């Protein structure tokens, strides 16, 4: 490929050669998720479809995303897999009566759950954008369906944030509001803007970032609250009794501090040089510094803890693979923006941790969860359901630095930087 700035520095072994090899290994692992009756199954620790797990909407979307990116990059021909996922979302997961997308479908075709989640719909938007860029049939229809549901039910013009959860008929809106759905909204909206150039997407992404970073994070000493009431008042004790929840954990989520740090800097590229956005770099650096200080080796053992309380004490000690992936991406982005070699030192250290402890050399992909002694566990994350975070960590340094992954791939293919 020859586009990795890291290789030009000669200061890390985790440059193009390593990243390309790992990306191809991850994609090969993910190919085992394809199932005959539509979409992608939930992979276990050995890369086999777990027949006890339903097909989850967000997993379908993440698979479309990773196959789509690597296909458009030319790393492999995955057009049939992208089409397979798009068809499943359109034909199986879409609610023909009430619109929107179900949360999960079991392997027999039965709907699972009684809600429609903003989290899922943001990933549908992201997948639809990437599939459209890949030229896959059915993708524009999927994009329109995702956009319609988001416009009608999830985007809140009063607070300029995304709603989180509706019932199946879109008649009752749950009072919970969350940061997680809005974080992935920023990712999807930025990708949609890069593809369509519709300012609606950019305006929404910037509004979400401003409220999240310049209000919620700043007003809480850069310890970003995750959970809110319907009027967007922080609920700091939410899930105190269920602290290791997969999507709504108690307290401060270390990986999300890193993820927001990266995302806001990527969005910031679209308003670079404009007045009034000084909070972007400030916020990104503050979030990163807090995640590093309180997350890495927080219990005197290598790796990042999952969560901490409001006194910066570890709560869930598990080492989630996605947290390390987001950490190396944030380090890379801040190094690209600032040129500060300390960020590259972090990048190298944390990739070394992934290389030694997280990558599964026997069965492939990455161990999704380790305990504080670095033993593989499945307390919060059974199996290895997707490669989304891991592949992103491999691809980001290989591509031109742009607001979204698909935008970067498009520019990469044009041969410009």
Q: Each predicted region: which residue ranges?
A:
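Glycan-recognition and catalytic cores of secretory/periplasmic carbohydrate-active enzymes
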Residues: 1-417
């Amino acid at each position: 490929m020859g586009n990795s700035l890291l290789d030009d520095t000669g200061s890390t072994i985790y440059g193009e050669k390593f990243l390309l090899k790992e990306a191809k290994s991850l994609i090969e692992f993910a190919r085992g998720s394809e199932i005959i009756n539509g979409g992608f199954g939930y992979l276990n620790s050995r890369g086999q479809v777990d027949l006890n797990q339903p097909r989850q909407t967000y997993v379908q979307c993440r698979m479309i995303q990773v196959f789509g990116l690597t296909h458009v990059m030319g790393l492999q021909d995955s057009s049939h897999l992208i089409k397979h996922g798009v068809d499943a979302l359109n034909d199986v997961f879409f609610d023909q009566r009430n619109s929107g997308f179900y949360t999960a479908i079991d392997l027999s075709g039965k709907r699972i759950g009684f809600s429609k989640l903003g989290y899922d719909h943001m990933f549908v938007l992201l997948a639809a954008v990437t599939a459209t860029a890949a030229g896959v049939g059915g993708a524009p229809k999927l994009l329109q369906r995702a956009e319609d549901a988001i416009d009608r039910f999830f985007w809140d013009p009063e607070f300029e944030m995304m709603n989180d959860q509706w019932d199946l008929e879109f008649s009752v809106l749950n009072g919970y509001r969350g940061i997680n759905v809005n974080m992935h909204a920023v990712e999807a909206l930025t990708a949609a803007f890069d593809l369509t150039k519709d300012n609606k997407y950019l305006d929404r992404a910037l509004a979400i970032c401003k409220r999240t970073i310049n209000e919620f994070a700043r007003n809480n000493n850069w310890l970003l609250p995750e959970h809110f009431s319907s009027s967007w008042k922080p609920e700091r004790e939410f899930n105190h009794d269920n602290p290791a929840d997969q999507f709504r954990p108690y307290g401060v989520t270390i990986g999300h501090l890193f993820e927001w740090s990266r995302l806001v800097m990527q969005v910031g590229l679209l308003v670079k040089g404009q007045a009034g956005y000084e909070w972007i770099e400030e916020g990104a650096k503050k979030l990163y510094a807090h995640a590093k200080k309180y997350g890495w080796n927080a219990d005197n053992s290598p790796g990042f803890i999952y969560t901490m309380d409001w006194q910066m004490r570890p709560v869930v000690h598990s080492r989630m693979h996605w947290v390390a992936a987001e950490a190396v991406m944030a380090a890379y982005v801040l190094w690209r923006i600032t040129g500060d070699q300390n960020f590259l030192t972090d990048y190298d250290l944390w990739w070394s941790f992934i290389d030694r402890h997280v990558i599964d050399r026997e069965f492939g992909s990455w161990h999704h969860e380790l305990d504080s002694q670095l033993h593989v566990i499945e307390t919060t994350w059974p199996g290895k359901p997707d490669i989304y975070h891991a592949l992103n960590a491999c691809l980001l340094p290989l591509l031109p630095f742009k607001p979204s992954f698909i935008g970067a791939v498009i520019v990469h293919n044009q041969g410009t930087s």
